[in-house]
Each structure stands twice: as C-alpha cells, then as structure tokens.
Amino acid sequence: VSLGRELSDTVNMSIGYASVERLPSVIELFMNGPHNATGRLETGNPNLKSETSDNFDITFNYENGEYYGYASFYVNDVDNYITLMDEEDDHDGHDGHDDDDHPAGEPHDPHENLIHADYVQEDAEFDGYEIEFGRTMSLASGELTLSFGRDVVNAKFADGHNVPRINPSRNVYSLSYKQDDIVFKLSMKDVDKQNDIGEGETATEAYQMLDTRLTKTFDLSGKS
C-alpha cells in the first residue's frame, strides 16, 4: 500500500506499508557442508519457520529545474528473521594448526580450518535511510550531472545484539557526462568503519573505492 501527496510544485511525499512473508530457502533448511567462498562449514535447520515482516517507509522527492533530490526513511520489523550465525567458540583455534595436532596416520579433516556456522532465526528490526541530491547542467554539447548520496542501515535482534553481516554506512560522490551516444561516469564510495558488529565478528576498516566507466552506444539497424 502506498499513498502519495504533492507538498508543493517541487516536493512530493509518499508513505508506504508492506507485509511480506518469506519461506526458508533450500540452503537455509538443508545445507550441511563447506562454503569455501566464505570460509564456513554451514549447517541448515529443517525446523525454520517462515519470515514475516512489516515494512514502513516514507520518501520525499524534490525537483526544481537543474536540481533534484530525494530522501527515504524506513523501518522493517521482521519476525523469525533467518541468518547465518557463527559458533562463537569456533573462531578460536583455527590458526596455528600443525601436523603435531594429529595422531600419526590419522588423515587431516579437510574442513578443520572452516568456521562452523548455523542457520538460526530470531526477531529483528532494521531501520535506516537513503538520501541523494544533485544537479544536472548543460556543458558544451552534453549534460553534466553531479550528485552526492548516503545510505545507512541499522539492524538489531530483539535481545539487543547486532545482526551480523550488515553493510556499513557509506557516502557516494558521483559525476556523469552524457553527449550523444557517449556516457562517462565517475563515482567515489567513501565507506565508514563498521563497529556495529554481530557476535564473533571483527570490525571492518573504512575504505574508499573509485569507479570509472565509459560507454558508447552503436545503432546496428543502419537507420539514421
């Protein structure tokens, strides 16, 4: 359900609500083996129930000539949220293994260095916001767009501890230039340090990432 209203000639607002149910995936139910990409030995749970969530959001859009912007705020209240939770005591002792740990003649466990993790579920709440504003202007025979955006998400379980593997807040600075069939884009992501970590996790450091892209569109139909 979504309701919208114009607040002025340049600003409109919309309010949305959604009730969503998600069944556990096959992996979440029956996984029982290594996931080498994440360095984990994952165990599913056939007793998992469906996730249900009530999602609320409010969005403001602004457009006035060359200038534009939007801001969106949301709260998602999730019952029986499914997540992969590391076994706490399994983070210790994975480094420093050597051959002396194994009796003579006993084969190595190929999964001994993987962190054991289980699919579990618990009530959780997510909240956050996304904002972006920018300006599009004529430059030479094309259009130049400059923008800034930021997104933030917070997630906690009902007992107060943090949901694991949540993306840190980030700022995104973007520049794009379009002229005829050529588009050049440049963006710099300034990602914050993540201190709101789940059980068994370690903080991730802040970092910056610069992306560039140049594209040209060709008409293969032969029509002018």
At which residue positions do the language-model features occur?
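Hydrophobic, lipid-facing positions within transmembrane beta-strands of outer-membrane proteins
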Residues: 1, 13, 44-46, 54-58, ...
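Membrane-spanning beta-strand positions in outer-membrane beta-barrel proteins
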Residues: 2, 12-16, 57, 68-70, ...
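Residue-level signature of outer-membrane beta-barrel architecture
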Residues: 3-6, 19, 50, 60-64, ...
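Surface-exposed extracellular loop regions of Gram-negative outer-membrane beta-barrel proteins
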Residues: 5, 9-55, 75-113, 189-199
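Outer-membrane beta-barrel transmembrane strands
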Residues: 6, 49-68, 122-127
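Short coil turns and loop connectors of transmembrane beta-barrels in diderm outer membranes
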Residues: 9-10, 54, 65-66, 139-142, ...
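Transmembrane beta-barrel outer-membrane domains
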Residues: 39, 49-53, 122-126, 162-168, ...
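Gram-negative outer-membrane beta-barrel transporters
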Residues: 66, 73-78, 91-195
